[in-house]
């Protein structure tokens, strides 16, 4: 979860249920472990669930292809837009659903189920906010306030 270097697994990826490791009890990603903050520096960071919720409910999502890559063009009421590629996800070295589905981390961890963190899932027909094991390799769309 939130790797700051390729193929790294941080302390958030494991918990007692799977490895016998400790359970950290955190609800929000630490700044020092935020891949967006580490890789982009400055004020960039991984968006939180409130920001994903706003994007989900307040913007227009249009499935499209840009530069031969499927994904959503997300347009705000003021006309600003971003493109989120359907990049799929990684489980270990295996890459799944590229160009079909998108999986994007939020900075919020599921405090009640220590193994999971919240993310935004989408495909051509669905957009769902869910939680998933922190051990998966999902995309990060950095935001800057």
Give the residues covered by each predicted segment:
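Conserved positions within compact, well-structured domain cores
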Residues: 1-145
């Amino acid at each position: 979860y939130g790797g700051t270097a390729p193929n790294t697994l941080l302390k958030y990826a494991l918990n007692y249920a799977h490895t016998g490791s400790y359970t950290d009890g955190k609800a929000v990603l630490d700044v020092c472990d935020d891949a967006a903050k580490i890789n982009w520096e400055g004020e960039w960071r991984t968006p939180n669930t409130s920001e994903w919720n706003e994007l989900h409910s307040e913007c227009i999502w249009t499935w499209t292809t840009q530069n031969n890559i499927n994904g959503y063009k997300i347009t705000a009421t003021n006309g600003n837009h971003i493109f989120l590629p359907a990049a799929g996800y990684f489980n270990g070295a295996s890459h799944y659903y590229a160009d079909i589905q998108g999986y994007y981390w939020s900075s919020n961890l599921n405090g009640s189920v220590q193994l999971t963190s919240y993310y935004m899932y989408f495909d051509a027909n669905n957009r769902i906010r869910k939680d998933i094991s922190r051990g998966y390799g999902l995309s990060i769309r950095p935001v800057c306030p």
